[in-house]
C-alpha cells in the first residue's frame, strides 16, 4: 500500500508572479503543456523505451535510488506544471471561484425547467475554460463579480440558493455575507411582473413568509438538538475520559429508551384500563410505614404495581350469564375489553417490539463499527478533519480540543499496541497465567451460585421469614453483596495476568462478570418458579415474585450507591490525604456495564408479575447517571492506557440481547405455558395456564356474533399454529443474515476503493517520473542542438589554424 504524497513544492517565481493567483491564461498554458508533452511522448516511444531500459539498469545497480525523485532535482518546467495541478490550486483564487458560480447561476436562471439539486457538481476548482473567461480581455474586479453573483443568487429559489452557497469553497464568513446580501432582493423577481424593478406586495409577503418559515425551522432544529438529554455532559465525559468511558453512559441512555418504550405500552393497555375500572379491594387498605420503599410489600401489594391487583373480567361492559359458572361472559353483540387477553397480549407484544428494536439497534451498531475494516489514514483524518469551524464559544472550543486530544491518544495507543508483539516464551507464560486465573474466576462464580441456592433454601424452610417483612430483604442483600464482592476478587486476580491490550482486558472482565451474573440469575429463576410456586400453593405467588424482583432492583441500586461512595470517593480521599498520591481510581467499565445489564434483566423478568417495574428502572437509571457522572468527574481519572472503544457499544448491545433478553424471554415463556397461575388473584386465576386465556377469548368471540367470526380463525391459524412462529423467526433471522452480508459487502467495497486510491497514488508518482524524464531528455536535446549550432557557427579561420597546428 502506497502512502499518500505529502510534499511542498519550491516553485521558482518571477517578481511579477508574487501576490497573484493563476489566471485563465496560465491554466490554458498548463493544458497546452500537457498536450504537447503527450504528443512528444507518442512520437518518441522507441527512444523512451531505450531510455527506460537504461534507467532500469541504473536502478538495479544502485540500491539507494528510489521511485519518487526529490523535488529539489525536478526541472523548473516540471515544478511549474505540478504547482498548477488542480489539487494544488484549490481555493487559491477567490475571484475565480465567484466568477465560476456567477456563470453557474446565469446558466440556472436561463434554463426553462429547474434542475434537480442532486445534479449540481460540487467541484472545488473546475476548469475555467468551460465558462469562456479567457475570451474576456478585461477581467472584472472582485467586488463587481461578487455583486453580480449576489444578483444572480437573488433570482434563484431559496433551496437552490442555499445548496449553491453550501457548495462554494469559501470561508464561513464569506458564505454568511453572501447569504445576508442575497436575502435582500433589489431587482425584479423572476417570473413575476413588475414595473421599474419593484416587487409587488404579494411577492414581498411570500418572500417574508418563506424566510420566517425557514428561520422557524432552523430554530426548531437547534432547539431539538439542545433538548437532547445529557448532550453537553456526554461531550464533556468523552473529551476528558475517552470513548471507553463514554460508551458506558451511551449504553445507559439506550437502556433508558428501551424502558420508556416498554412502560408506554404497559401503561396504555394494562394499567390505564385497570385504573379506569378499578376492582373492589379485598379488605381495608394497609397503612404505609415507609419500609415499603425497600420491600415493595405492604400498601403497595393491592395496587396496579403487581399482578394480583388486575381482574379477570371485562372492563367496559356488564356481564351476562357466565359461560362456565366462574368466568364473566359478555352479552351477545358486544366486543368487550378482555383483561386477561389484554394482559397477556400486551406483555407479548411489548417483548416482541423490544426484540425488534434491540436487534435493529444491534445491527445498526454493528454496521457502524465494523463496516470499515482498517484504520489506515485515520490519524490524518483526525488531525485535519476533526475541528468543527462552526464552534464560536470558548467553552465549546475547549471541549472540542479535549475531544480531539483524547481521540489522538487512543489512536496512537492502538497503533503502538499493534507494533509491539510478544515473544513465544512470553505468550506461553501469559497463556498459563490466563488459564489459572480463569479457573479461579469460574470457581468463584460457581461458589456464588451454590451460596445463593443454599441461602434461598434456608429462607424457604425458615418459619420467621414469612412473619417479618424486614427479613425479606436478607436474600436480596446477600445476592447484592455477592454481586459486589466477586467482581473485585476477579479484578484482583486479573492483576496477575499481563494483558497487552486494554480492550482485551475489558472484554475478559466482562465475560467473567457475565458468567457470575448468569449463574446467580439462573439459580434465582429456579428458586422462584421451581420452589416458590410449590411452597406458596393457595397464595398469590405472582405477587411474591414481583415483590422479590422489586427488592432485588432496589437493593442493587443501594449497593451501587455505597460502592460509589466507598469505592471511589473514600479511596480518592485516602489516596490524596494519607498516601500523598495524586493517582485517582479509574472507572471500572466492565463491572458497571454488567450492573446495568443485570438490572435490566431483572426488569424484563418482572414485567409479567409487576407491570410498573420499568418505571422503577427508569427512576433508577436517571439517578445512576447523575451519581456516576458526578463521581466520575470528581473522583476518577482518565485511563492510564488510552484505548479506542470503537466496538464497545456493539458488544454491550449483543450482551443485552442474547444472554439477558433471550434468558428473560425463555423464563417468561416457561411461566406462561407451563406454570399454573394462582387461583386467588390475578387475571388468570381460573385457568390452568396463562396461555389458555386466548382460547377462552376465542369461545367468547364465537358467542359474540358473526361480525367477529374472523378473529377466532386468526387466533387458531396464526397464534396457536407453531408454523407461523417458526416463519416469523426464520424471517427475522433472514433479515439479520442479509444485514450481515450487506455490511460485509460494504467492507469489501471500501477495501477495494482504498486499494484503488492507493493505486492512483502510485500512478501519479509514475506519471510525474515520466514527465520528469521527458523534460530531462528535452533539455539534453536542446543542449546538444545548441552545441551543434555553436560548432557550425565557428569562424573558418579558427578551423584552418587548428588544422595547421
Curated annotation (Swiss-Prot):
Intervals, Lumenal compartment: 1-209, 271-338, 453-469, 527-553, 626-650, 744-805
Gene Ontology MF terms in the entry: mechanosensitive monoatomic ion channel activity
TM annotation in the entry: 210-230, 250-270, 339-359, 432-452, 470-490, 506-526, 554-574, 605-625, 651-671, 723-743
Omega-N-methylarginine PTM positions: 94
Tissue expression profile of the protein: Expressed in placenta, prostate, testis, activated T-lymphocytes and lymphokine-activated killer (LAK) lymphocytes.
GO biological process: intracellular zinc ion homeostasis; protein stabilization
GO cellular component, one term: plasma membrane
Sequence similarity: Belongs to the TMC family.
Biological function: Acts as a regulatory protein involved in the regulation of numerous cellular processes. Together with its homolog TMC8/EVER2, forms a complex with CIB1 in lymphocytes and keratynocytes where TMC6 and TMC8 stabilize CIB1 and reciprocally. Together with TMC8, also forms a complex with and activates zinc transporter ZNT1 at the ER membrane of keratynocytes, thereby facilitating zinc uptake into the ER. Down-regulates the activity of transcription factors induced by zinc and cytokines.
Subunit structure: Interacts with TMC8. Interacts and forms a complex with TMC8 and CIB1; the interaction stabilizes each component of the complex. Interacts and forms a complex with TMC8 and SLC30A1/ZNT1; the interaction regulates zinc transport into the ER. (Microbial infection) Interacts with human papillomavirus 16/HPV16 protein E5; the interaction alleviates TMC6-mediated transcription factors inhibition.
Protein name, per record: Transmembrane channel-like protein 6
Organism per entry: Homo sapiens (Human)
Amino acid at each position: 500500500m502506497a502512502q499518500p504524497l505529502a510534499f511542498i513544492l519550491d516553485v521558482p517565481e518571477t517578481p511579477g508572479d508574487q501576490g497573484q493567483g493563476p489566471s485563465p491564461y496560465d491554466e490554458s498554458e498548463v493544458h497546452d503543456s500537457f498536450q504537447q508533452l503527450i504528443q512528444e511522448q507518442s512520437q518518441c516511444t522507441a527512444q523512451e523505451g531505450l531510455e527506460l531500459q537504461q534507467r532500469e539498469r541504473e536502478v538495479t545497480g544502485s540500491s539507494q535510488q528510489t521511485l519518487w525523485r526529490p523535488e529539489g532535482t525536478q526541472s523548473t518546467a516540471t515544478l511549474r506544471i505540478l504547482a498548477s495541478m488542480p489539487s494544488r490550486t484549490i481555493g487559491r483564487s477567490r475571484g475565480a471561484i465567484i466568477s465560476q458560480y456567477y456563470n453557474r447561476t446565469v446558466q440556472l436562471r436561463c434554463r426553462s425547467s429547474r434542475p434537480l439539486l442532486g445534479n449540481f457538481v460540487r467541484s472545488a476548482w473546475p476548469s475555467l475554460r468551460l465558462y469562456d473567461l479567457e475570451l474576456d480581455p478585461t477581467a472584472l474586479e472582485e467586488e463587481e463579480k461578487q455583486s453580480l453573483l449576489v444578483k444572480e443568487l437573488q433570482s434563484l429559489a431559496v433551496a437552490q440558493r442555499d445548496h449553491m452557497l453550501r457548495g462554494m469553497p469559501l470561508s464561513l464568513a464569506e458564505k454568511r455575507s453572501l447569504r445576508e446580501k442575497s436575502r435582500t432582493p433589489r431587482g425584479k423577481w423572476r417570473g413575476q411582473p413588475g414595473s421599474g424593478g419593484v416587487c409587488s406586495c404579494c411577492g414581498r409577503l411570500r418572500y417574508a413568509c418563506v424566510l420566517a418559515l425557514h428561520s422557524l425551522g432552523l430554530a426548531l432544529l437547534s432547539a431539538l438538538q439542545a433538548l437532547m438529554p445529557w448532550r453537553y455532559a456526554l461531550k464533556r465525559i468523552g473529551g476528558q475520559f475517552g470513548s471507553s468511558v463514554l460508551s458506558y453512559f451511551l449504553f445507559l441512555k439506550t437502556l433508558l429508551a428501551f424502558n420508556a418504550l416498554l412502560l408506554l405500552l404497559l401503561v396504555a393497555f394494562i394499567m390505564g384500563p385497570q385504573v379506569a375500572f378499578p376492582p373492589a379491594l379485598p379488605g381495608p387498605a394497609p397503612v404505609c410505614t415507609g419500609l415499603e420503599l425497600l420491600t415493595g410489600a405492604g400498601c403497595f401489594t393491592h395496587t396496579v404495581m403487581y399482578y394480583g391487583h388486575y381482574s379477570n373480567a371485562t372492563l367496559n361492559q356488564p356481564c351476562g350469564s357466565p359461560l362456565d359458572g366462574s368466568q364473566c361472559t359478555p352479552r351477545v353483540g358486544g366486543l368487550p375489553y378482555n383483561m386477561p387477553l389484554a394482559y397477556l397480549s400486551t406483555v407479548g407484544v411489548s417483548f416482541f417490539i423490544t426484540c425488534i428494536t434491540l436487534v435493529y439497534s444491534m445491527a445498526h451498531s454493528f454496521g457502524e463499527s465494523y463496516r470499515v475494516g482498517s484504520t489506515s489514514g485515520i490519524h490524518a483524518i483526525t488531525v485535519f478533519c476533526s475541528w468543527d469551524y462552526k464552534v464560536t464559544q470558548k467553552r465549546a472550543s475547549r471541549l472540542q480540543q479535549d475531544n480531539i486530544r483524547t481521540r489522538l491518544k487512543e489512536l496512537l495507543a492502538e497503533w503502538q499496541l499493534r507494533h509491539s508483539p510478544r515473544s513465544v516464551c512470553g505468550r506461553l507464560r501469559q497463556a498459563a497465567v490466563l488459564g489459572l486465573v480463569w479457573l479461579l474466576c469460574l470457581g468463584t462464580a460457581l461458589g456464588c451460585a451454590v451460596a445463593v441456592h443454599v441461602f434461598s433454601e434456608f429462607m424457604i424452610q425458615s418459619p420467621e421469614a414469612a412473619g417479618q417483612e424486614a427479613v425479606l430483604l436478607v436474600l436480596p442483600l446477600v445476592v447484592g453483596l455477592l454481586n459486589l464482592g466477586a467482581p473485585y476478587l476477579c479484578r484482583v486476580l486479573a492483576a496477575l495476568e499481563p494483558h497487552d491490550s486494554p480492550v482485551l482486558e475489558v472484554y475478559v472482565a466482562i465475560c467473567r462478570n457475565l458468567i457470575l451474573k448468569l449463574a446467580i440469575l439462573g439459580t434465582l429463576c429456579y428458586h422462584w418458579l421451581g420452589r416458590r410456586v410449590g411452597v406458596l400453593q393457595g397464595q398469590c405467588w405472582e405477587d411474591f415474585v414481583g415483590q422479590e424482583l422489586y427488592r432485588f432492583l432496589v437493593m442493587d441500586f443501594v449497593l451501587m450507591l455505597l460502592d460509589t461512595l466507598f469505592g471511589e470517593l473514600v479511596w480518592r480521599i485516602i489516596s490524596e490525604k494519607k498516601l500523598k498520591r495524586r493517582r485517582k481510581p479509574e472507572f471500572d467499565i466492565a463491572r458497571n456495564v454488567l450492573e446495568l445489564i443485570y438490572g435490566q434483566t431483572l426488569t424484563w423478568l418482572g414485567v409479567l408479575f409487576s407491570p410498573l417495574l420499568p418505571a422503577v428502572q427508569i427512576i433508577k437509571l436517571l439517578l445512576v447517571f447523575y451519581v456516576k457522572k458526578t463521581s466520575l468527574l470528581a473522583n476518577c481519572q482518565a485511563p492510564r492506557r488510552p484505548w479506542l472503544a470503537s466496538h464497545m457499544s456493539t458488544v454491550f448491545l449483543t450482551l443485552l440481547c442474547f444472554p439477558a433478553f433471550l434468558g428473560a424471554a425463555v423464563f417468561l415463556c416457561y411461566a406462561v405455558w407451563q406454570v399454573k397461575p394462582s387461583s386467588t388473584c390475578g387475571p388468570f386465576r381460573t385457568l390452568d395456564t396463562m396461555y389458555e386465556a386466548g382460547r377462552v377469548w376465542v369461545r367468547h368471540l364465537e358467542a359474540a356474533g358473526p361480525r367477529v367470526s374472523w378473529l377466532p380463525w386468526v387466533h387458531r391459524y396464526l397464534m396457536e399454529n407453531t408454523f407461523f412462529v417458526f416463519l416469523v423467526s426464520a424471517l427475522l433471522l433472514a433479515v439479520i443474515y442479509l444485514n450481515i452480508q450487506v455490511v460485509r459487502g460494504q467492507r469489501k467495497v471500501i477495501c477495494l476503493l482504498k486499494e484503488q486510491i492507493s493505486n492512483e497514488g502510485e500512478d501519479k508518482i509514475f506519471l510525474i517520473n515520466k514527465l520528469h524524464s521527458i523534460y530531462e531528455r528535452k533539455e539534453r536535446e536542446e543542449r546538444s542542438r545548441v552545441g551543434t549550432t555553436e560548432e557550425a557557427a565557428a569562424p573558418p579561420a579558427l578551423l584552418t589554424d587548428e588544422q595547421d597546428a
